[in-house]
């Protein structure tokens, strides 16, 4: 009688060999769409400006005009919005490159831990940026009668429309980042089934 060490095959290893690869492609597609959404939000808000000329006074029959330009740089919340979505775009671009070219390099699962943490931080950053922009957008659309802040969207309609489109794109990117974060955490917590050595009696 001799003892022979036999490796126990992983359950479902052969029929589901395409499963992890398909899941990886799904995650890559989610990251790519999230990149497009946050990049669109960044570009639209960063390029958002509108110039209008208003009559501010009249001396006799001569109107006094003033030219005013609305730009995202005038509002710190919109500046933060551009920075947050820009960093979210860079994050997803780096993650896509990492999954595509350096997937094989993983030291004791450290890669998945780092990816999960960065995904959560990026989602939190985008959430802060878009919510700050929503607050200022609501203030620009409706004003605040208690603080005597006038609305501006009745005068700068194009500026507000472009800002609203950027906010919608950012919310899409945020939703996708939340889904990506959940997938990253599931990948991190999912136990891996190592090969189990079993002793088989051989005649």
From Swiss-Prot:
Q: Write down the Pfam families for this protein, in alphabetical order.
A: CASP_dom
Q: Locate the coiled-coil region(s) and give their ranges.
A: none
Its GO CC terms?
plasma membrane
Enumerate the subcellular locations listed in this protein's record, separating them with semicolons. Cell membrane
Extracellular topological intervals: 46-76, 136-165
Give TM segment ranges.
Answer: 25-45, 77-97, 115-135, 166-186
Membrane association type: Multi-pass membrane protein
Q: Which InterPro entries match?
A: CASP/CASPL, CASP_dom, CASPL
Q: Which residues lie on this side of the membrane: Cytoplasmic?
A: 1-24, 98-114, 187-203
Record keywords, A-Z: Cell membrane, Membrane, Transmembrane, Transmembrane helix
> What PANTHER family does the database record attribute to this sequence?
CASP-LIKE PROTEIN 1U1
What does the annotation say about its assembly with partners?
Homodimer and heterodimers.
NCBIfam families recorded: A_tha_TIGR01569
Q: What protein does this entry describe?
A: CASP-like protein 1B1
């Amino acid at each position: 009688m001799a003892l022979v060490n036999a490796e126990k095959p992983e359950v479902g290893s052969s029929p589901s060999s395409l499963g992890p690869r398909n899941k990886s492609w799904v995650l890559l597609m989610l990251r790519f769409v999230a990149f497009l959404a946050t990049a669109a939000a960044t570009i639209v808000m960063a390029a958002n400006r509108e110039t209008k000329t208003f009559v501010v006074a009249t001396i006799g029959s001569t109107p006094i005009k003033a030219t005013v330009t609305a730009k995202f740089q005038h509002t710190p919340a919109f500046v933060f919005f551009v920075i947050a979505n820009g960093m979210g775009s860079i994050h997803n671009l780096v993650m896509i490159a990492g999954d595509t070219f350096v997937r094989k390099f993983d030291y004791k699962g450290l890669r998945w831990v780092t990816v999960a943490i960065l995904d959560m931080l990026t989602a939190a950053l985008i959430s802060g940026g878009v919510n700050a922009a929503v607050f200022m957008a609501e203030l620009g659309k409706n004003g605040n009668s208690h603080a005597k802040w006038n609305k501006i969207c009745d005068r700068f309609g194009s500026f507000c429309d472009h800002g609203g489109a950027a906010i919608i794109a950012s919310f899409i990117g945020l939703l996708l980042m939340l889904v990506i974060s959940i997938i990253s955490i599931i990948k991190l917590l999912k136990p891996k089934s190592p090969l189990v050595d079993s002793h088989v009696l051989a005649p």
